[in-house]
Amino acid sequence: MANETLRLALQPREITGKKVQSLRDQGILPIGICGRGIEPYSAQVDEREFNKVINQAGYSGLIELSIPGQKRQVAFLLEVQRNSVTNRIIHADLRVVDANAPVELDIHVALQGENDMVSRGNAVLNLVQSVIRVRALPGDVPHQIDIDASSLTEIGQQILVKDLSLPATVEILDDVETLILTLGYPQAEEAPAAETAAE
């Protein structure tokens, strides 16, 4: 499912360097804006509003930027820096993209549904590949790639990249034979086999 475009109101930022701490003390987050075809510039945003938007968008959600004196821009979150003690976001970078040109992004895999064998303790799900590389127009980028965990009913069954079902507007760039998910024995059941082999 493609993303709903989120909106973020930014203000130009003139304060840089160590002085940006004064902004953080006021609940204002310093932002860096970059992207192909634009001159990088500094901005700032209300910290609470930013956290609200980013909690929904993550790294694959399209964000429409509103900046006084500038034309409409759309962007993806590129990077965040956090305080090592409090884990509070202290700086973020946004990457402006062309809404009409394809982008390449890593999209997280999300397991959906309940697997009966796992629930009974007879198996474990092994997520081998947690992100999938895709190419799509910014407005068509999926927020996540859902996989039905209940579809695996026997030990050894697998889900590969070629088994994924995505809209025609989204191109998967990973090798089609890449393993994503497998249903295996619980570790406790594998141990006896390993001991037998050792003997």
From Swiss-Prot:
InterPro entries the UniProt entry points to: Rbsml_bL25/Gln-tRNA_synth_N (IPR020056), Ribosomal_bL25/Gln-tRNA_synth (IPR011035), Ribosomal_bL25_b-dom (IPR020057), Ribosomal_bL25_C (IPR037121), Ribosomal_bL25_long (IPR001021), Ribosomal_L25_dom (IPR029751), Ribosomal_uL5_bac-type (IPR020930)
What GO terms are given for molecular function?
A: 5S rRNA binding; structural constituent of ribosome
Keyword annotations of the record: Ribonucleoprotein, Ribosomal protein, RNA-binding, rRNA-binding
Give the GO biological process terms: translation
Cellular component GO terms, alphabetical = cytosolic large ribosomal subunit
For this protein, the record's Pfam families field holds:
Ribosomal_L25p, Ribosomal_TL5_C
Q: Which PANTHER family did the record assign?
A: RIBOSOMAL PROTEIN L25/GLN-TRNA SYNTHETASE, ANTI-CODON-BINDING DOMAIN-CONTAINING PROTEIN, RIBOSOMAL PROTEIN L25_GLN-TRNA SYNTHETASE, ANTI-CODON-BINDING DOMAIN-CONTAINING PROTEIN
Sorted alphabetically, which HAMAP family does this protein's record hold?
Answer: Ribosomal_bL25_CTC (MF_01334)
Name the protein family.
Answer: Belongs to the bacterial ribosomal protein bL25 family. CTC subfamily.
* Quaternary structure and interacting proteins, as annotated: Part of the 50S ribosomal subunit; part of the 5S rRNA/L5/L18/L25 subcomplex. Contacts the 5S rRNA. Binds to the 5S rRNA independently of L5 and L18.
What job does the chain carry out? This is one of the proteins that binds to the 5S RNA in the ribosome where it forms part of the central protuberance.
Q: What is this protein called?
A: Large ribosomal subunit protein bL25
Q: What is the lineage of its organism?
A: Bacteria, Bacillati, Chloroflexota, Chloroflexia, Herpetosiphonales
